Regions:
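Zn2+-dependent metallopeptidase catalytic domains
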Residues: 1-295
């Protein structure tokens, strides 16, 4: 396999499923490029596909715009002045793919496959595994230090001065480290029974009263929830403590970081390059970023 499929610089690994994904992407590229290169009737699915593909491929436009595509969202987050506003903002951000603190979804109830269940799941950290925040060996410490500098550089690209960028980085690390300490490890997440805590909405409100769950569910657009599963209770309770005890300005910095981090690969070449330098090279071991059409 290794002789027939030498590892290219854009991959840190390449197995049979990677090959399937690569072949699938090539076929999709051909289909989309054909649609994007022709005139399409306004309002059709083809027109929408062409518009979003051509926009994503227009690096000159993205480089000119810089931080502009997410500037209004950064300002919206910065407008939060009270902890009571954080829950509704979390729900609001979910509509643009940003889920700070924890994630959520609707999926089959693992104890009753005929029913779907709203589920809360741990999240909120940007390094994937809790050990990156907590282990003290040389390799992990080096990654953590590079992550800190990466956060600073990204805030600088977003228009923050050096002092503000470093202050924001400290806030991000404080919050993410607290979430990491309470989170389940990858091994612990493999135990289905330990990651299933079905309860009524009223029970959730009593267990985690520091979050306005009615406002949150209404904000994300979910109605009629009477039962749900809290996959990992401890990190959700830790988030409750964070929201109610950490100064709002630190939480603003954290949520702004989640936005910048999530949007980085869709912004200008400077953001893309810095994002790849850390997540691609440092964290994943890749030597070269993928071409724009793959990203």
């Amino acid at each position: 396999w290794m002789k027939k499929h030498p590892l290219t610089d854009e991959y840190s690994r390449f197995g049979s499923f990677d090959m399937l994904a690569e072949n699938n992407r090539e076929q999709l590229k051909g289909l989309i490029a054909e649609i994007a290169g022709q005139e399409n009737e306004k309002g059709t699915v083809a027109q929408k596909i062409a518009d979003i593909y051509n926009l994503a491929m227009d690096s000159a436009k993205l480089n000119t715009e810089g931080i502009e595509p997410i500037k209004a969202d950064l300002e919206r987050i910065a407008s939060v002045k009270d902890k009571a506003e954080i829950g509704p903002l979390m729900a609001e951000l979910s509509h643009i793919g940003i889920r700070p603190y924890f994630t959520f979804f609707v999926d089959a109830d693992i104890m009753d496959s005929k029913s779907n269940l709203f589920q809360l799941y741990q999240g909120g950290i940007s390094l994937g595994e809790k050990e990156y925040y907590l282990d003290t060996d040389e390799a992990t410490t080096d990654i953590r230090n590079k992550y800190k500098e990466h956060i600073v550089k990204m805030f600088r690209l977003a228009g923050f001065d050096e002092s503000a960028a470093r202050k924001n980085m400290e806030a991000v690390l404080e919050i993410e480290t607290r979430i990491a300490k309470a989170s389940f490890s990858a091994v612990e997440q493999r135990n289905p029974a330990a990651n299933y805590h079905k309860m009524t909405l009223d029970e959730l409100k009593k267990s985690v009263p520091g979050i306005d769950w009615d406002a949150f569910l209404s904000g994300v657009g979910v109605k009629g929830v009477t039962e749900l599963s809290v996959s990992q209770v401890e990190p959700i309770k830790e988030v409750e403590k964070i929201i109610n005890t950490i100064p709002v300005e630190k939480q603003v910095a954290y949520m702004q970081w989640k936005l910048i981090n999530r949007a980085a690969s869709y912004l200008s070449d400077e953001f893309v390059a810095q994002n790849f330098d850390f997540y691609g090279k440092t964290l994943s071991g890749r030597k070269e970023n993928q071409p724009r059409w793959k990203r």
